[in-house]
Amino acid sequence: MGEMEREGAAAKAGAAKTGAAKTGTVAKTGIAAKTGVATAVAAPAAPANVAAAQGAGTKVALGAGKAAAGAKVVGGTIWTGKGLGLGLGLGLGAWGPIILGVVGAGAVYAYMKSRDIESAQSDEEVELRDALA
C-alpha cells in the first residue's frame, strides 16, 4: 500500500469517526469546500495540502490549507529588519530593545562592580595577613 493510499484511507476513516461524512459538514482543517453533497476532509497525519475528497463533483480549494500550514511567520523583529520590536509577543513594540539594552547594561555594570569589590576585599585580606604575620 503506497503512501498516498494510506493517507486517503486515513482521511476516510477520520471522516467516518467524526461524522462529517454523514452530516455533510466540513471539518475544521483549513480546507474550504464548495457547499454541496460531497465533503472534503484532510487526514490527521497528512500535510494540510493533501485532502481526500468524497463523492463526485467536489471542488476543494487547497490554498487555505497551504497558507495556514506552510506560511512563514511574518513579523517585525530586529532580526528580519521589518521593525523595531523583539517579536516576543509581549506588546513592547519599539520599547522592547530599549528595555533589553538597559537591563543588559545594568547586568554588566553589576558584574563589573562585584568584581571590583571582590578584588578589593582580597587585597585587604592579603594586607591583613601580612600585617598579622
Curated annotation (Swiss-Prot):
Role of this protein:
Promotes the formation of magnetite in Fe(2+)-rich conditions, when magnetite is not readily formed. Binds Fe(3+) and Fe(2+). May play a role in nucleation of magnetite crystal formation. May help control production of crystals with a specific morphology. Greatly improves the formation of magnetosome-like magnetite crystals in vitro. Isolated short protein, probably residues 75-133, binds up to 18 Fe(3+) per monomer and self-assembles into micelles about 21-26 nm in diameter; the C-terminal 21 residues also self-assemble.
Q: State what changing residue 133 to C does.
A: Mature protein forms worm-like structures and spheres
The yes or no answer to whether the keyword DNA damage is present is: no
Q: How does it assemble?
A: Full length protein oligomerizes. Full-length protein interacts with MamA.
Q: Which organism is it from?
A: Paramagnetospirillum magneticum (strain ATCC 700264 / AMB-1)
What does changing residue 116 to A do? Makes wild-type crystals; protein is in magnetosome membrane
Q: What is the effect of changing residue 79 to A?
A: Self-assembly of the mature protein is reduced
The disulfide bonds in this chain are none
Q: What is the effect of changing residue 95 to A?
A: Self-assembly of the mature protein is reduced
Give the protein's recorded name.
Magnetite biomineralization protein Mms6
Q: Which family does it belong to?
A: Belongs to the magnetosome Mms6 family.
Molecular function as annotated in GO: metal ion binding
| Cellular compartment(s) | Magnetosome membrane
Determine if Membrane is one of this entry's keywords.
yes
Which residues lie within the region annotated MIC, self-assembles, binds magnetite, Fe(2+) and Fe(3+)? 112-133
Keywords of the record, alphabetical order, are: Biomineralization, Iron, Magnetosome, Membrane, Metal-binding, Transmembrane, Transmembrane helix
How does it sit in the bilayer? Single-pass membrane protein
**Residues on the Lumenal side?**
104-133
Q: Which domain of life is it from?
A: Bacteria
Bilayer-spanning residue ranges: 83-103
Use of this protein: Transfection of a codon optimized gene into human adipose-derived stem cells yields cells with magnetic crystals; the crystals do not have a noticeable effect on cell proliferation, migration or differentiation.
Segments on the Cytoplasmic face: 1-82
Ranges where the record places region GL repeat: 83-92
Q: Changing residue 79 to F does what?
A: No change in self-assembly of the mature protein
Reported impact of residue 131 to C? Mature protein forms a lattice
State any further remark: This bacteria makes up to 20 cubo-octahedral magnetosomes of about 45 nm in diameter which contain membrane-bound crystals of magnetite (Fe(3)O(4)).
